[in-house]
């Protein structure tokens, strides 16, 4: 009997170990916003020139061509969707460029110190941009990574990643400008803030705050989508900046999420910077009613 028990144990133990290993390797399902499946992405790997892709945008919300910038080079890139070959125009020298938006026929590029570069979208095919305008000292001092342009209202929204009073107030502050296309001017049109204290108390984000890295808006619901690479979360807020939900992102799928945009089919796109082991990429999530 002892020999029989020993033989049973001899065969059962390896089976149990194998079962445990298989269970560990099973894909963990992460939460998704309503209408999207963050466990089922269409992945577009970037070329080496866009390893540090830091912002994405679409022209008139058309998803066939993606426009982007990367962290260090003052270049405005364009690619057909799922076409790795990129073309670009030079709009500035090397610096720290964090986000991009296209407002009708004008491109907006945000530098980390809050300086905004604008130039005609029509110049995207030129080797170098000729008609560039730079807006300095129009934002409160701080670090900025998020810009969104509303084609219907001609308004531009910017979020502060690190601003003096935000940590103390447990809030995230932002600024609104209206763009005068004819005069090529940004007119101050208000400020806003979002209370992040609840997220801090629930330990959904760090005590240092949300640290927004990208911003976009659902044109149908008016809801704001705010990405935080530091906290690995996507926050969805009401049109008046009240937090509605916080989506925890899978760090193995979202390596360093820095860019965010919708197309006219309501597909949601999130770009990720690459590193020594992986290429930069853009993840597309199709909308499911």
Give the residues covered by each predicted segment.
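Bacterial Sec-dependent N-terminal signal peptides
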Residues: 1-34
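Sequence/structural signature of beta-propeller domains
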Residues: 24-289
């Amino acid at each position: 009997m002892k020999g029989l028990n020993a033989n049973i144990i001899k065969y059962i133990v390896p089976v149990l170990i194998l079962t445990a290993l298989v269970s560990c390797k099973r894909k963990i399902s992460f939460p998704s916003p309503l209408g999207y499946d963050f466990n089922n992405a269409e992945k577009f790997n970037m070329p080496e020139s866009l390893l540090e892709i830091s912002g994405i945008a679409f022209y008139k919300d058309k998803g066939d061509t993606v426009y982007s910038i990367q962290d260090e080079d003052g270049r405005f890139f364009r690619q057909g969707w799922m076409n790795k070959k990129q073309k670009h125009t030079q709009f500035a020298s090397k610096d720290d460029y964090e986000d991009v938006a296209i407002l009708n026929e004008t491109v907006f590029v945000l530098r980390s110190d809050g300086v905004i570069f604008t130039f005609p979208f029509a110049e995207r095919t030129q080797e170098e941009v000729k008609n560039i305008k730079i807006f300095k000292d129009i934002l409160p001092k701080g670090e900025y990574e998020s810009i969104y342009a509303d084609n219907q209202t001609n308004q531009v929204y910017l979020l502060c990643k690190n601003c003096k009073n935000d940590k103390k107030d447990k809030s995230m502050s932002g600024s609104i400008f209206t763009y005068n296309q004819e005069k090529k001017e940004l007119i101050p049109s208000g400020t806003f803030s979002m209370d992040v204290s609840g997220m801090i108390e629930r330990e959904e984000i760090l005590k240092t705050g949300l640290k927004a890295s990208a911003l976009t808006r659902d044109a149908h619901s008016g809801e704001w989508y705010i990405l935080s690479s530091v906290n690995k979360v996507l926050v969805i807020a009401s049109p008046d900046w009240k937090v509605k939900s916080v989506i925890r992102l899978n760090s193995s799928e979202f390596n360093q999420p820095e860019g965010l945009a919708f197309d006219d089919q309501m597909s949601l796109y999130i770009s990720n910077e690459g590193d020594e082991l992986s290429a930069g990429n853009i993840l597309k999530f199709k909308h499911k009613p």
